[in-house]
C-alpha cells in the first residue's frame, strides 16, 4: 500500500515533539523542513531523537523522517508537489514567509494544509495570505493543545521534552490521521482552548514575570496568583456558557481544573518569559485577551480581572522582545491614542488603563 507523503515545516518543539510522532505512528512518509542549519545538520547526522514525556515516565523514539533546509527551494517545491499533507509549526507570524514556495509549486493533486499554530483559524488565515488560484489545495483549520516548553536540561540537543497529553482537533477532511480528531465545526473547540488554555497560561506567565519568578509552576505556588487565575477561569466559564448554550458547565469546570494541574507540573519547567512574548499579537482582536473582554462585556461579567490582565500586558517590558519594546516606547512617549488603538478597548475601559499607566510613569 502506498504511503501517505507528508511535508512538515518547522523542527521546533511542536514539530519534533508532537507532529512527527503522530505522523510516524500513522506510518506516513515524512519530510521535515527547517531553516536553522545547525538543527538540520544534527537531524541529518543523527537521523533520530527521543521525545521525553514530562507527565509520565515514557519516551518515544522518532527515526523515520528525512530533513531538508528551507533554503533548498527546488527540493522543497518538488516535495510540496508530491505531498498529500503539508503542515506547519513555525509560528503564525512566520507563515507569510512560505508564500513564494506556494506560488511556485504546481499542485497536480489534492493536498491538505494543516497549520498547527496557536491562534484563531490559522489555516484559513494562511489561505487568505497565499491567495492561491489552485483549488487542489485544501486548507483545514486545526486546534492543538499540548505543552512543549523550551527545556533547559537536555543530554541531547535534538531531544524534546513535552507532555504526552495532547488534544488535536481539525475540521473534517478526506484523510484519517490517528491522533487528530475531526469535527464538523471547530468553533467551540477553538474558543475553549484559546480562553482556558492559551489565555490562562499567558496570565500565569504575566503574574510570574512581574514577581520575578522564573517558572509557571513557581507562579502557581503563590496562593494569590492561583486565586486570581481560578477566579478568571470561573468568569471565562460563566461567559462561555452564556454565549454557547451547548457547552456543559461541569465539563468546562473539569477542563479548566485539569489545565491548572497541567500548568502546575514542576517537571515541565515552563519559562514565564516563553508565554508573554509578542504582546501586540496577544492584544489582537482575533486573540485571547480581546476575546475574553468582548465576551465579558457582552454577557455583563465584571471587567476588573481582564482589565488587570490588559494592564499587565502593557506593563511587561522584555528587553529582547521587539513588540514589548515597542509598547514600552509608546508608554514612555505617552502615545495614548496609538496605545488605545492597539488595545482595542472601548473608551471607558481604556481610560482606566491609561490612568494606571500614567501613575506608573509619574512614579518613575
From Swiss-Prot:
Keyword Thylakoid assigned: no
EC top class named in words: oxidoreductase
GO cellular component: cytosol
Keywords tagged on the record: NAD, Oxidoreductase
Catalytic activity: D-mannitol 1-phosphate + NAD(+) = beta-D-fructose 6-phosphate + NADH + H(+)
Domain of life of the native organism: Bacteria
Record's keyword annotation contains Cell inner membrane: no
E.C. numbers: 1.1.1.17
Pfam family, one: Mannitol_dh
Matches recorded under InterPro entries: 6-PGluconate_DH-like_C_sf (IPR008927), 6PGD_dom2 (IPR013328), Mannitol_1_phos_5_DH (IPR023028), Mannitol_DH_C (IPR013118), Mannitol_DH_N (IPR013131), NAD(P)-bd_dom_sf (IPR036291)
Listed GO MF terms: mannitol-1-phosphate 5-dehydrogenase activity
GO process terms (BP): mannitol catabolic process
Annotated positions binding NAD(+): 6-17
Cystine residue pairs: none
Family: Belongs to the mannitol dehydrogenase family.
Listed HAMAP family: Mannitol_dehydrog
Listed PANTHER family: ALTRONATE OXIDOREDUCTASE-RELATED, MANNITOL-1-PHOSPHATE 5-DEHYDROGENASE
The protein's name: Mannitol-1-phosphate 5-dehydrogenase
Gene symbol of the encoding locus: mtlD
Amino acid at each position: 500500500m502506498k504511503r501517505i507523503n507528508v511535508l512538515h515545516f518547522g523542527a521546533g518543539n511542536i514539530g519534533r515533539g508532537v507532529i512527527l510522532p503522530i505522523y510516524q505512528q500513522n506510518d506516513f512518509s515524512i519530510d521535515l523542513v527547517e531553516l536553522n542549519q545547525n538543527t538540520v545538520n544534527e537531524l541529518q547526522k543523527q537521523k533520530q531523537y527521543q521525545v521525553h514525556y514530562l507527565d509520565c515516565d515514557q519516551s518515544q523514539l522518532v527515526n523515520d523522517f528525512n530533513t531538508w533546509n528551507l533554503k533548498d527551494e527546488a527540493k522543497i517545491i518538488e516535495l510540496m508537489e508530491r505531498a498529500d499533507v503539508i503542515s506547519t509549526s513555525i509560528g503564525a507570524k512566520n507563515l507569510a514567509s512560505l508564500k513564494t514556495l506556494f506560488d511556485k509549486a504546481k499542485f497536480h493533486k489534492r493536498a491538505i494544509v494543516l497549520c498547527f499554530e496557536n491562534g484563531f483559524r490559522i489555516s484559513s488565515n494562511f489561505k487568505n495570505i497565499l491567495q492561491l488560484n489552485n483549488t487542489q489545495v485544501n486548507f483545514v483549520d486545526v486546534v492543538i493543545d499540548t505543552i512543549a516548553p523550551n527545556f533547559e536540561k537536555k543530554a541531547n540537543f535534538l531531544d524534546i521534552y513535552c507532555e504526552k497529553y495532547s488534544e488535536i482537533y481539525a475540521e473534517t477532511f478526506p484523510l484519517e490521521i490517528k491522533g487528530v480528531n475531526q469535527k464538523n465545526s471547530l468553533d467551540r473547540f477553538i474558543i475553549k482552548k484559546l480562553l482556558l488554555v492559551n489565555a490562562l497560561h499567558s496570565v500565569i506567565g504575566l503574574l510570574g514575570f512581574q514577581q520575578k519568578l522564573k517558572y509557571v509552576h513557581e507562579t502557581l505556588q503563590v496562593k494569590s496568583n492561583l486565586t486570581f487565575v481560578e477566579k478568571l477561569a470561573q468568569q471565562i466559564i460563566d461567559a462561555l456558557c452564556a454565549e454557547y448554550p451547548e457547552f456543559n458547565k461541569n465539563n468546562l469546570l473539569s477542563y479548566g481544573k485539569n489545565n491548572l494541574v497541567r500548568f502546575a507540573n514542576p517537571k515541565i519547567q515552563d519559562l514565564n518569559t516563553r508565554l508573554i512574548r509578542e504582546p501586540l499579537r496577544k492584544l489582537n482582536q482575533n486573540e485571547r485577551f480581546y476575546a475574553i473582554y468582548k465576551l465579558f462585556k457582552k454577557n455583563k461579567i465584571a471587567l476588573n480581572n481582564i482589565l488587570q490582565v490588559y494592564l499587565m500586558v502593557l506593563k511587561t517590558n522584555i528587553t529582547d522582545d521587539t513588540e514589548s519594546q515597542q509598547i514600552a516606547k509608546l508608554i514612555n512617549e505617552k502615545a495614548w491614542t496609538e496605545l488605545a488603538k492597539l488595545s482595542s478597548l472601548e473608551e471607558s475601559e481604556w481610560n482606566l488603563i491609561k490612568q494606571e499607566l500614567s501613575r506608573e510613569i509619574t512614579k518613575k
